[in-house]
Amino acid sequence: MQKIGIGLAGLGTVGTGVYRSLLQNNLLLTERVGLELEVRRIAVRNLSAPRKVQPPPAILSDRWETVVDDPNVGIVVELIGGIDLPYELFQRALKARKPVITGNKALLAEKGAEIFELAADVNVPVFFEAAVAGGIPIIKSIREGFIGNHLQSIHAILNGTSNYILSRMTEAGIDFPEALQEAQANGYAEADPTLDVNGWDAAHKAIILASLAYGFWVDSRLVYVEGIEHVSAADIRFAHDLGYRIKLVATIRADSNSSVEVRVNPTLVPQGHVLASVNGVFNALMVRGDIVGDTLFYGRGAGQDPTASAVISDLAQAAIWIDSGGKAFGFTPHGLYGKCLPTDELVSGFYLRLTVDDRPGVLAQVAGILGTHDIGISSMIQPEGHDAAAVPLVLMIHNAPFGRMRTAVEEIKRLACVKGPPILLWILS
């Protein structure tokens, strides 16, 4: 039976899970794939650091180049993180005609076009199931399972940390700082949670999904990204009273002109929608195709074992490609869809919360500004029980282009009767 050598660049949390799982399920993999997979080289940052697994010292190195250049390594697994160094690894490995597996969403979001152009030139596959939604096989599903569908939309919860925080804010009525502190104490948020809570972790994943779905590599500068830091317990409560839950949602969809919308932002999700019931650290994706209709994917989107599972799935596919040859696959560009819609042209309903003076005429001033921008109010709540001179005013806005809505909010903010910054959230449609 043919043996195929694996090189791991990185032995951190995910790398450790991959190495352990390969040892644990080696016989199962061999029987299912018909090939024997063997780790032959591992690159680590510090050779003397303590580890939860103990590979043979002879296969360890503190230089990633030894993984790529080893003639006994046929598949390279990039688990280093970052952009510049992994990009260099990709170039070197692909030019050596070695398939590369990665879970590096930031790298693919920023350098995907260049990576896949090189991969196509040398006819070597790139695998990246672990880059989006952990153990949920969404990449394979879009690339293969839905290959005969025009994908009309993807709505997804793609970041477990932000979803945990919003879930705790909903369940316990606490504000963002307290929920974040709880997430960190329970190991669901990093010491530096910036990319999780500012929306960019989910945005990197959304860029990858949109690029696969629509056949052109999406420029991150054209993606609207907003985090959850400004969402308050009051917004959670008001949204609930209106029949919604607030989630950080990635919205990816094509319009009738074949233009593509890609955004990530806190979104009011109707309580009856399936995404509204996705709580804690779980991820979920609802994919709508013109033939298949609605499909739902749900599971753990991060963590050692779910991510390792995705990497091992890719290892099996890479080994089969080496054994059988054929055309490499990864990302196939095409011209069926034209461009990303500019942010200001994106259309949605909106939730607008203002803090205003408690006196007659305030609503008329706000509605007047909205009206001058051809923006309509669908409903309004003004919660009672506030003794202060300033009170909350919550407006639900009919569908409108974001550019017009943003301009109107800037004008409303300058009214003397408005106290504090307005809160504007999108509504799932």
Language-model segments: what does each one mean?
Residues 178-277, 282-284:
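Substrate-binding/catalytic subdomain of NAD(P)-dependent oxidoreductase enzymes
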Residues 120-201, 208:
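Rossmann-like NAD(P)H-binding beta-loop-alpha module
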Residues 1-95:
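N-terminal glycine-/serine-/threonine-rich beta1-alpha1-beta2 phosphate-ribose binding loop
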Residues 310, 315-429:
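A conserved regulatory-domain signal marking ACT and ACT-like small-molecule sensing domains
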